[in-house]
Regions:
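Phosphate/diphosphate ligand-binding glycine-rich loop within oxidoreductases
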Residues: 1-24, 142-144
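Short, acidic/turn-prone active-site loops that include or flank metal/cofactor-
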Residues: 7-11, 65-67, 161-165
Length: 176
């Protein structure tokens, strides 16, 4: 049978594929789909989204603290391949008109990070995204100090649909 990486500390390509399929179906158009990432992006789902941006024409906007930048060789490869990836230290710029907002990991998951680094997903930041923007997080729900109650409620509301999409994607991949 096929070997499928359904997710671990290094990545979650199955989740990335499922999320992208769900978000594209929800939005209806790859070309204008804007995905935002807020927080650390050294590994995991963030790197899978960077890789996916090589093959799918969505826009990936990432607000990254200094300690949370993705692998530079992966980023360089993606940009050379034509991926539409935009990096910033300004979360307001990154979240503006986003159709999906990922809450990346915080400094507690990065040994080199100062404890004060990173941005929580506040109501003020979330208000910059599209009104119906999906809120997603790296491992289930983010700790309450990383997101407002509104953001956590939106992430929780989207979680069942996201989990179902992942199970469907994994079933399709296992059937190969």
């Amino acid at each position: 049978g096929a070997v499928v990486n359904a997710g671990n500390d290094k990545g979650a390509p199955g989740q990335a594929l499922a999320d992208l399929a769900l978000l594209a179906a929800r939005h209806g158009d790859w070309e204008s789909l804007r995905i935002s990432w807020l927080g650390g992006a050294q590994c995991g789902l963030a790197c899978d989204l960077i890789t996916a941006a090589i093959y799918a024409p969505f826009e990936l906007f990432m607000a990254l603290p200094e300690w949370g930048e993705p692998d530079h060789s992966l980023l360089d490869m993606a940009l050379r391949a034509g991926a539409k990836i935009f990096l910033s230290r300004d979360p307001e710029l990154v979240l503006e008109n986003a159709h999906a907002v990922y809450m990346g990991h915080g400094p507690e998951q990065c040994a080199a990070a100062p404890l004060t680094s990173g941005w929580p997903l506040t109501d003020e930041l979330l208000a910059l995204a599209a009104e119906d923007a999906a809120v997603l997080s790296w491992h289930g729900l983010a700790p309450a100090d990383r997101a407002s109650d509104t953001a956590l409620r939106r992430a929780a509301a989207f979680w069942p649909e996201r989990l179902a999409a992942r199970r469907l994607m994994e079933a399709r991949l296992y059937a190969l």
